[in-house]
Amino acid sequence: MNFEDQEEDMEMSGVNPPCGYDSLSGEGATSSGGGGVGRSKGVGAKIRYRECLKNHAVNIGGHAVDGCCEFMPSGEDGTLDALKCAACGCHRNFHRKETESIGGRAHRVPTYYNRPPQPHQPPGYLHLTSPAAPYRPPAASGDEEDTSNPSSSGGTTKRFRTKFTAEQKEKMLAFAERLGWRIQKHDDVAVEQFCAETGVRRQVLKIWMHNNKNSLGKKP
């Protein structure tokens, strides 16, 4: 599912996006940086995009999220890929928006467009709703999920789990610590060489570093 399809889903649900909605053209109230962090224009506030709230079971009247904990842009600022999460493949507006003011207090911006509208039922009837899917934490350090883009038909996202050998995990850990758990532009040559030597794709390495930097990364 591309960005246009995702925005059409929000329109078809009959609910307007929350304030601060960022369109594909990039004309929004905020601008984002790497790691789901941005700064609002004209206001000294930092913006973060936290867990993904997209409802993948809206077509069957249920509620299920993918477990992505924080937005991570797939591309550089100013590109369409910058609005797409590299971890879950969803548009940035599906992630919970959190604004941190100068004083350091976080303000959560509510998101309304992820839960499907409930059909009206006359009083006196038992109202049944589908149970929410249990929270699924990010993949452990031994395995990593490489998420493909959702199909245009709106079906469930396919996930392919990548298995790493002990040698690959050891090399990725050492390489991630050397880069400071973040791939920057000047690291492209080293990353390409590392991927060629280990057989791990760049995108898989990037997602692995994102999911494991808090659990495996050295404390400052």
Swiss-Prot record:
Keywords: DNA-binding, Homeobox, Metal-binding, Nucleus, Transcription, Transcription regulation, Zinc, Zinc-finger. It is found in: Nucleus. GO terms for cellular component: nucleus. Residues 31-40 have a biased composition (Gly residues). Its main location: nucleus. Disruption phenotype: Arrested at early embryo stages. Residues 1-40, 100-160 are annotated as: Disordered. Pfam families: ZF-HD_dimer. Residues 157-220 bind DNA. Residues 1-11 have a biased composition (Acidic residues). GO terms for molecular function: DNA binding; protein homodimerization activity; zinc ion binding. It comes from the Eukaryota. A zinc finger (ZF-HD dimerization-type) spans 49-98. InterPro entries: Homeodomain-like_sf (IPR009057), Homeodomain_ZF_HD (IPR006455), ZF_HD_homeobox_Cys/His_dimer (IPR006456). Mostly expressed in flowers and, to a lower extent, in inflorescence, stems and leaves. One of its GO terms (biological process) is embryo development ending in seed dormancy. The record marks M209 as: Required for DNA-binding. The homeodomain differs form the typical one by having namely 4 instead of 3 extra amino acids inserted in the loop between helix 1 and helix 2. Essential protein. Putative transcription factor. Homo or heterodimer. Interacts with ZHD1, ZHD3, ZHD4, ZHD5, ZHD6, ZHD7, ZHD8, ZHD9, ZHD10 and ZHD11. This is Zinc-finger homeodomain protein 2.
